[in-house]
Amino acid sequence: FAGTTGGSATVYRSTNGGSSWSLVNSGLPSSGINRVEVAVSPSSPNKIYAVYGASNSGFYGLYSSSNYGNTWTQKSTSPNILGWEANGSGTGGQSWYDLTLAVDPNNSNTIYVGGVNIWKSTNGGSSWSINAHWYGANGLPYVHADHHHAGFRPNSSEFYLGTDGGVYKTSNGGSSWTALNDGMNITQYYKISQSQTDTTLLIGGSQDNGT
């Protein structure tokens, strides 16, 4: 399965290792969207999920299929799990830039959607709870914003997120997260300056990760 981007973002399926592709969009949206990510349940390969970003880059909807993508059903359109707020309020988001989707290998109804924050559903996408927040609001676990990839370690409960701030891991379904960034040169500096009175003193401003 593959998802596309743009105003006609949709889902394709290949049954021959990618040599050819067919459109599988019965029940999926065709307007007001900008991107879709797709994930297959490892424990129930017939069950597929698709998360859509809206044209304003907020949450458009979560869709599921139980017949290998032949038909799709909308499961939810709220809260705004692709926005910045811990309670899912507000509009807009960053699906144009960051969007990821993963299915728990041991439970086809447990799914994670990452964008600015990471959200979790335990009922196949019908309802959501925030799993971690981009600056740890309201006592929530902190995970750096902008999630681009998510995946489970085989034969374990370990779940990993790749973000603009490095790699994060949870082993307890998101109750707590650990940064795995020791030794990773991931700080992107936009500006740097040297003191005019002390040649050993430098200051730099980095993307997301401090000054």
Describe the residue ranges of each PLM region.
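Beta-propeller blade termini and top-face loops
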Residues: 1-211
